[in-house]
Amino acid sequence: MATITIYDQTKKEVGSMDLAPEVFEVPVKPEILHLVVRSQLAAKRQGTHATKTRGMKRGGGAKPWRQKGTGRARAGSTRSPLWRGGGTTFGPQPRDYSFKVNKKVRRLALKMALTSRLSEEKMMVVKNIDLPEIKTKLFVEVAEALGLEKALVVVKDADNKLLLSARNIPGIKLITADQLNVYDILKARQLVMLENAAQDLQERLK
């Protein structure tokens, strides 16, 4: 069983925590992480792109010139895809890009992402972050003390002081434990969890 040091918000050691091997010591399979990240990114796509076919274009009802006798190529509509201002052939239409990934696979991928960050020593557990008021400057001071740059900070419950103080800092993303996902973990250089969030996560993923 792995253990991890617990720090306070000034980065002083205040204890340690045992990490469940079934959550933080699972074999990492890149293909599963890739599948889940692809699924997350696909679900984010709006899919509202659209082009008009010749039938959707306004006008083009009258035949431009008679069928025979002009010496020109025959034409039936000014909205043919061959014409400037005509419709588009096989252009994109609105669609849903999302695809299903089984819950067990998503859960396994989350464990793999956590294992990966722990093995790379890019994970930190902090006892608590306590701010006296909502102020970005106060959170910046904590982030600098902890050495955070491009970091994902995970809290157990939505704390308004923390959420509002951290939301305007470039490179810092703060989410609750139940929002934790594979894409955010892998995108961030550092994963920082409050102690109660780490405990809650372990219990849920065991």
From Swiss-Prot:
GO terms for molecular function: rRNA binding; structural constituent of ribosome. Keywords: Ribonucleoprotein, Ribosomal protein, RNA-binding, rRNA-binding. Residues 44-87 are annotated as: Disordered. GO terms for cellular component: ribonucleoprotein complex; ribosome. It comes from the Bacteria. Pfam families: Ribosomal_L4. GO terms for biological process: translation. SUPFAM superfamilies: Ribosomal protein L4. Belongs to the universal ribosomal protein uL4 family. One of the primary rRNA binding proteins, this protein initially binds near the 5'-end of the 23S rRNA. It is important during the early stages of 50S assembly. It makes multiple contacts with different domains of the 23S rRNA in the assembled 50S subunit and ribosome. Part of the 50S ribosomal subunit. This is Large ribosomal subunit protein uL4. The gene is rplD.
